[in-house]
Amino acid sequence: MDRRTKEQVAVELHEKVKSFKLAVLANFSGMGVAKMTTLRNDLRKSNAELKVVKNTLLRIASRDTSLEALQDDFKGPLALILGYGDPVEPSKILSDFAKKNAELELKIGMLSDKVITVEQLSALAELPSREILLAKLLSVMVGVQTQLVNVLSAVPRGLVQVLDGYRAKKEESN
């Protein structure tokens, strides 16, 4: 690559690095093209991407961003995984892929602007997705309203049952 191309790539990468929600550095030594393509496609479905970038370009692109905190880990052949949406989905994909493929070694990550370890990334992967958490919250909120309606309607319902029993008893006596 000539200097202009490198500068352009660094600027584009800098823009992407400024907007990530999840960033993961991984060693991919020995991984074949087919596996790398599969991983890229899976990540793309979850609003994330995998970039193989030279360490010097990554150092330049990460200046004045939160990713600058990981500069000590920019060593060896690196894959940079950037997630732009819900961080749980890409972390699940990476954790599952790393378990099945020993060639992918997750090194360190960053959640927004906090450095996370591989263990914390695995814990993040165990969380339910955002949609599932929202559904659980909604069911709790609806459950409270349903219980409130049941409690409030219990007194009138009881009164109606007492009056109906009184009416039935009166009809029997007549």
Swiss-Prot record:
Cell membrane recorded as keyword: no
Lineage: Bacteria, Pseudomonadati, Thermodesulfobacteriota, Syntrophia, Syntrophales
GO cellular component: ribonucleoprotein complex; ribosome
InterPro entries attached to this UniProt entry: Ribosomal_uL10, Ribosomal_uL10-like_sf, Ribosomal_uL10_bac, Ribosomal_uL10_bac_type
Family: Belongs to the universal ribosomal protein uL10 family.
Keywords: Ribonucleoprotein, Ribosomal protein, RNA-binding, rRNA-binding
Domain of life: Bacteria
MF terms in GO: large ribosomal subunit rRNA binding
GO biological process, one term: translation
Designated name of the protein: Large ribosomal subunit protein uL10
Natural source organism: Syntrophus aciditrophicus (strain SB)
Quaternary structure note: Part of the ribosomal stalk of the 50S ribosomal subunit. The N-terminus interacts with L11 and the large rRNA to form the base of the stalk. The C-terminus forms an elongated spine to which L12 dimers bind in a sequential fashion forming a multimeric L10(L12)X complex.
Family matches, as NCBIfam families: PRK00099.1-1
Stated role: Forms part of the ribosomal stalk, playing a central role in the interaction of the ribosome with GTP-bound translation factors.
